């Protein structure tokens, strides 16, 4: 018997590989009638110090992430996915995408690109 998924998470970073994972995620969500969680993590490790991480930098990163995610949300809904959820977090992508977000969102399948 084939595995059925209820909540599929796709990690998006703007790369071509992530876009390919997104397409597979949309197809999997449609095939399983599943919720599609689209996750993006703003990598704060690249910021050198707390002083460089001011409100303006935060706002710009957040606005860019929201714009990217709205685009993916629209694509998923246009493809026919009924339940689409967006998650934007700041921090270490490895820990957030592998553990924190999937646990919080009760994800049972994670799709990521090779970037």
Residue ranges: model-predicted function:
Residues 53-57, 102-105:
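Short, hinge-like loop/turn segments at secondary-structure boundaries
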Residues 1-3, 74-110:
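Structural beta-alpha unit
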Residues 69-73:
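A conserved short alpha-helical segment within the catalytic HATPase_c
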């Amino acid at each position: 018997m084939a595995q059925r998924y209820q909540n599929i998470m796709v990690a998006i970073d703007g790369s071509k590989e992530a876009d390919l994972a997104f397409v597979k995620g949309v197809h999997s969500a449609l095939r399983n009638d599943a919720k599609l969680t689209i996750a993006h993590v703003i990598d704060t490790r690249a910021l050198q110090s707390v002083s460089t991480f001011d409100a303006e930098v935060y706002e710009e990163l957040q606005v860019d992430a929201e714009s990217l995610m709205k685009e993916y949300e629209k694509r998923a809904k246009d493809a026919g996915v009924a339940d689409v959820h967006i998650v934007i977090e700041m921090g270490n992508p490895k820990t957030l995408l592998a553990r924190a977000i999937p646990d919080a969102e009760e994800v049972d399948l994670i799709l990521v690109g090779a970037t």
